[in-house]
Amino acid sequence: MESGNVVNTQPELSGIIDGSKSYMYEQLWKLCAGPLCDIPKLGEKVYYFPQGHIELVEASTREELNELQPICDFPSKLQCRVIAIQLKVENNSDETYAEITLMPDTTQVVIPTQNQNQFRPLVNSFTKVLTASDTSVHGGFSVPKKHAIECLPPLDMSQPLPTQEILAIDLHGNQWRFRHIYRGTAQRHLLTIGWNAFTTSKKLVEGDVIVFVRGETGELRVGIRRAGHQQGNIPSSIVSIESMRHGIIASAKHAFDNQCMFIVVYKPRSSQFIVSYDKFLDVVNNKFNVGSRFTMRFEGDDFSERRSFGTIIGVSDFSPHWKCSEWRSLEVQWDEFASFPRPNQVSPWDIEHLTPWSNVSRSSFLKNKRSREVNEIGSSSSHLLPPTLTQGQEIGQQSMATPMNISLRYRDITEDAMTPSRLLMSYPVQPMAKLNYNNVVTPIEENITTNAVASFRLFGVSLATPSVIKDPVEQIGLEISRLTQEKKFGQSQILRSPTEIQSKQFSSTRTCTKVQMQGVTIGRAVDLSVLNGYDQLILELEKLFDLKGQLQARNQWEIAFTNNEEDKMLVGEDPWPEFCNMVKKIFIYSKEEVKNLKSRKSLSS
């Protein structure tokens, strides 16, 4: 079958998806296609994006196909109607795909619609990621008890060794016979005889997924889903080499010029290049602006649905040959790393808009960020906890640290620009200025310096001998103060109280200024003392937020700051030394947000 075939005469149209197949086939196909599969409805008005269709072909042909576009002067999206949908499976690899027949949108042709009142029988299904034992030559397939009861024919449990033969049909119509047995010391449900032949024929490996579907009448279906790393481009057996190289744009253009139907091949794991007309309009009206927060669905390594959160950092054409195209027009920045690949540019209809500081995105991000920063900072951050959480155990652990360990911890924090204000932002604790250190230190000091007169020994040390132990918090404070002063002023000064320690810590890191970008949950910090002007500041901010020249261009982002009097102004209007002396916090806003701030008089013009 060629993806670019042009049908010049209208065939007899069917009112259901793939009329030659049963509802059971459709359900099995969708489960094998995966959770992110989105097939348009029969008769639905859609937009067809040739760019997305091109992504299905081999990478070696993409450049040649892109070069055809200026010659053809073809639009980036085409309005069509869905005429027919055929759900199919590739013969050699069992990969699912759909043949979708499209026709240029016209009122002259009666388009069939899917019967929503069609009888839908109840089906039970389950999927399982295959283990090494499941794919072993000498093993069998272990079925979880819950799934065996729901999806497999019932066993006669009155027998000494409950056993039965079951018959399952795959997407090709082939029949597979398995022996279902309930045995073993763990009393497991197993598929034994026939399972090895199935795995060998399908070339199943560890990590693939097996799918079983059972209907109300007891009909059993079986399918597979390859692991993500085995998924390739569209097989050459589906689309010919000639069609891949020349047919996509040429056939679509011919169909629109002559108002005839054409067929496209749609793979479930490919990006959605056939988009519902209503969905596209919702996206256009939603207006995803630079700085907007979003979430996007992905399929994880275990075939479950995952969600990733990010920020839109730009809008641009994905290909120079398709101007003003919505296809992958949004440049995005992801909040955190993931074990699965994610694109740097996405289409507007692939993402969901989030309101600023959404509880979902904020809690998800901070959950991972918090665990990572706790491991990086270690016990040296325990002084940030409120008094109710800072007990003698934590302080005792800190007192065991040597001066060398303390210096290393403090150096790591300062070198990573982890100022106290930034650390506090990452944890749901009270600000340091509100902590009553006297209440924390005094009771512990009193307990430690109490004279013990009873004849008791602890770890071989007599408790009867009066002893005085220095306050561990003060010891740590003295060491941090000494290191700070030696590093900055080349001299040694001793701080005598926790209040002085706190004040000195803030003053010693004053050169680090907090930077917050619109749409990004966690801020950054920049050291203005090592920069020589606004140009270096802009370059440093681009590195921190991975903006790659977008701040210099100033066509999508603006930089603002607040001074000591909380006045907010745009960066660049003051002499650099004066700016460094008065800046309190730096902000990166989108152009739209700057306009809003000026309209509310929250930003000085």
From Swiss-Prot:
InterPro entries: ARF_dom, ARF_plant, AUX/IAA_dom, B3_DNA-bd, DNA-bd_pseudobarrel_sf, PB1-like. Keywords: Auxin signaling pathway, DNA-binding, Nucleus, Transcription, Transcription regulation. GO terms for cellular component: nucleus. One of its GO terms (molecular function) is DNA binding. SMART domains: B3. It comes from the Eukaryota. The keyword Membrane does not apply. PROSITE patterns: B3, PB1. SUPFAM superfamilies: CAD & PB1 domains, DNA-binding pseudobarrel domain. It is found in: Nucleus. Auxin response factors (ARFs) are transcriptional factors that bind specifically to the DNA sequence 5'-TGTCTC-3' found in the auxin-responsive promoter elements (AuxREs). Could act as transcriptional activator or repressor. Formation of heterodimers with Aux/IAA proteins may alter their ability to modulate early auxin response genes expression. Interactions between auxin response factors (ARFs) and Aux/IAA proteins occur through their C-terminal dimerization domains III and IV. Belongs to the ARF family. Homodimers and heterodimers. This is Putative auxin response factor 14.
